[in-house]
């Protein structure tokens, strides 16, 4: 506790924490040792000053050390967004996950209920008939038998219950909004991560490199989407062979047409589930295109596709052959089994 007081004092002066200090501070919070006032003080001091790569790396390390782990294939990928982009869009990364799985790449998806929309990944999947409140062993069975599994964050991060009330009372974004997507319980090293602000694209790629990821795309759409957007360019930081490269991609790079964000407005969980099922059944339109675009990037991360156009071709086959829809049916069956 005295250590935590010293670290809060350090941050209060504007100084930054080392990776080890941040890990120690967040361990205190997640173990329930820190008081609500101490948690709130540290979280807001970090937020106002701006969190560093070392601080985020240390915080993620602390969170990962307490999570309930899932056993998944070494080549599994995660397609995940921070949420909180305020767009209220359809569940793009969730739909893309089924396309990726249908293309033969195992998916260990990590997610939660809605942040700023009416339907987060967990809400949408539950509305599709998938049982989301599973044990780590049951999720591992889904990934290994169905080729796709969903890890509901509260089930795998029980230590987060110690910081939950403080986060609710602060009612503003904190470092915890970044930690979830970086703390996949299956320990995947191939990740496609969407973030709510361009400022985090490069830093989060660096954090994932620090923590041992192999292949990563961190993305932010120029229209604010925490996915690759159809509306214009998307900012990307890609980790490949130990190097981070920053660039932009457009729908045209993937052979797709642009579409305004309004075409992707979502509704509640039932409406978003119906839209997702429609894409898997072959319905054309902006939702299909944006899901293909994001799946294409995930297939690059997985090492299956070389370019976005390649990835779209694999994704199109996954949809048109019925393979993606079959993955949904398999996940419903195995999760409820």
Curated annotation (Swiss-Prot):
Residues that hold anthranilate 2 according to the record: 167
Pfam families referenced in this protein's UniProt entry, alphabetically: Glycos_trans_3N, Glycos_transf_3
Keywords: Amino-acid biosynthesis, Aromatic amino acid biosynthesis, Glycosyltransferase, Magnesium, Metal-binding, Transferase, Tryptophan biosynthesis
Gene3D superfamilies reported for this sequence: Nucleoside phosphorylase/phosphoribosyltransferase catalytic domain, Transferase, Pyrimidine Nucleoside Phosphorylase, Chain C
Binding site for Mg(2+) 2: 226-227
Residues reported in the UniProt entry to bind 5-phospho-alpha-D-ribose 1-diphosphate: 81, 84-85, 89, 91-94, 109-117, 121
InterPro entries: Anthranilate_Pribosyl_Tfrase (IPR005940), Glycosyl_Trfase_fam3 (IPR000312), Glycosyl_Trfase_fam3_N_dom (IPR017459), Glycosyl_Trfase_fam3_N_dom_sf (IPR036320), Nuc_phospho_transferase (IPR035902)
Top EC class of this enzyme: transferase
Name of protein: Anthranilate phosphoribosyltransferase
Gene from which the chain derives: trpD
């Amino acid at each position: 506790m005295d250590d935590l007081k010293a670290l809060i004092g350090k941050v209060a002066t504007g100084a930054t924490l080392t990776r080890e200090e941040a890990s120690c501070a967040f361990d205190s919070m997640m173990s329930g040792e820190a008081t609500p006032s101490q948690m709130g003080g540290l979280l807001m001091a970090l937020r106002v000053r701006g969190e560093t790569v070392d601080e985020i790396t240390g915080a993620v390390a602390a969170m990962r050390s307490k999570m309930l782990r899932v056993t998944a294939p070494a080549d599994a990928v995660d397609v995940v967004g921070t949420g909180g982009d305020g767009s209220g869009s359809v569940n793009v990364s969730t739909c893309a996950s089924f396309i990726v799985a249908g293309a033969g790449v195992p998916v260990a998806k990590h997610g939660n209920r809605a942040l700023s929309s009416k339907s987060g990944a967990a809400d949408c999947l539950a509305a599709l008939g998938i049982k989301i409140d599973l044990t780590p062993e049951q999720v591992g069975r889904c990934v290994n038998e169905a080729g796709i599994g969903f890890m509901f964050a509260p089930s795998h991060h029980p230590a987060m219950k110690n910081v939950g009330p403080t986060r609710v009372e602060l009612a503003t974004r904190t470092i915890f909004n970044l930690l979830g997507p970086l703390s996949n319980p299956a320990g995947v090293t191939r990740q496609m991560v969407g973030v709510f602000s361009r400022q985090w694209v490069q830093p989060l790629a660096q954090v994932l490199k620090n923590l041992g990821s192999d292949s990563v795309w961190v993305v932010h759409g120029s229209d604010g989407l925490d996915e690759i957007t159809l509306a214009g360019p998307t900012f990307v930081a890609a980790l490949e062979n130990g190097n981070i490269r920053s660039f932009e991609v457009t729908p045209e790079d993937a052979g797709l047409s642009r579409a305004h964000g309004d075409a992707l407005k979502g509704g509640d969980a039932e409406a978003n589930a119906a839209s997702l099922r429609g894409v898997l059944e072959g319905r054309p339109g902006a939702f299909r295109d944006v899901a293909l675009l994001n799946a294409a990037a995930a297939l690059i991360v997985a090492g299956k596709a070389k370019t976005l156009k390649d990835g779209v071709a694999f994704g199109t086959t996954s949809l048109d052959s019925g393979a993606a829809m079959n993955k949904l049916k398999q996940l419903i069956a195995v999760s409820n089994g």
